[in-house]
Curated annotation (Swiss-Prot):
InterPro entries: Leu-rich_rpt, Leu-rich_rpt_typical-subtyp, LRR_dom_sf, LRRNT, SLRP, SLRP_I_decor/aspor/byglycan. Binds to type I and type II collagen, fibronectin and TGF-beta. Forms a ternary complex with MFAP2 and ELN. Interacts with DPT. SMART domains: LRR_BAC, LRR_TYP, LRRNT. Belongs to the small leucine-rich proteoglycan (SLRP) family. SLRP class I subfamily. It holds the Pfam family LRR_8. LRR repeats lie at residues 74-94, 95-118, 119-142, 143-163, 164-187, 188-213, 214-234, 235-258, 259-282, 283-305, 306-335, 336-360. It comes from Sus scrofa (Pig). Residues 17-30 form a propeptide. SUPFAM superfamilies: L domain-like. It is found in: Secreted, Extracellular space, Extracellular matrix; Secreted. The lineage of its organism: Eukaryota, Metazoa, Chordata, Craniata, Vertebrata. The keyword Heme does not apply. This is Decorin.
Amino acid sequence: MKATIVFLLLAQVSWAGPFQQKGLFDFMLEDEASGIGPEDRFPEVPELEPLGPMCPFRCQCHLRVVQCSDLGLDKVPKDLPPDTALLDLQNNKITEIKDGDFKNLKNLHTLILINNKISKISPGAFAPLVKLERLYLSKNQLKELPEKMPKTLQELRVHENEITKVRKAVFNGLNQMIVVELGTNPLKSSGIENGAFQGMKKLSYIRIADTNITTIPQGLPPSLTELHLDGNKISKVDAASLKGLNNLAKLGLGFNSISTVDNGSLANTPHLRELHLNNNKLNKVPGGLAEHKYIQVVYLHNNNISAVGSNDFCPPGYNTKKASYSGVSLFSNPVQYWEIQPSTFRCVYVRSAIQLGNYK
């Protein structure tokens, strides 16, 4: 009886299943020899089934997270666990995403491909990712946005690439999209198709900063709450370009070349709370601030503003229903602070919220 028990224990040790990582930072392989010499012979037994999916070599797998970052990979690893929810492939040397690279990853929610050398993505590469919500492709060499992105996608970040075109067709059917980040690309206004973003009914956040665009993109969706266009070459704010943006709460237009803000522009954004127009070429305070009901933060520093009127920011009189300002910056403008009437800021919440300074 004892001999039988010893035989079974030895058989289990000798024919152990293949290596499986049990934790995110567990790279240690158990000793496969287990003290059994080559002269030992046992009858053949069926190979034990692995307890779970294999983890790609050198990657770390834990709780449906597969981390393969900073490994010098030049292609997507094979045999990825089918239950993977987050796949991190950032900081590698991958040059191409091919059809079949993500096959069987039907549970993937987040795909991180930041800081690779990707210049080509096959049209059907993302087709198997039927639950993908977040796609990070920043710091690569893409010239166009990928085609046939999953309809479940909510967040797309593709800044610091070589994108020159944004076609309306690439966003068709992406009705769940909330965030689009396209900053730091050699993109021009002519490269953005009119109404390219219009079909995304839930889109809330767009950032197209540090590009070569000269105008605010046309046909933006009314669902937008944040629009960041800082660091471009925009010279004028057109009232028509902001028409219909009834839900916009934050507008970033700093570090452009804006000299004019059309009358009525701010009226087209009735729920705007924060306006960044710093580091431009404005020679006066934009019209419409005093009548705007909700705006609370206005950045106008580093412009060419030489005078500030007593009704530029607040409605006439002290009995006003306008929301109080919590921040107004006017420093680094030609206007001298002692030339501004104290009543100019009668609707500012606290005096410390006003930033004035000498022009340099």
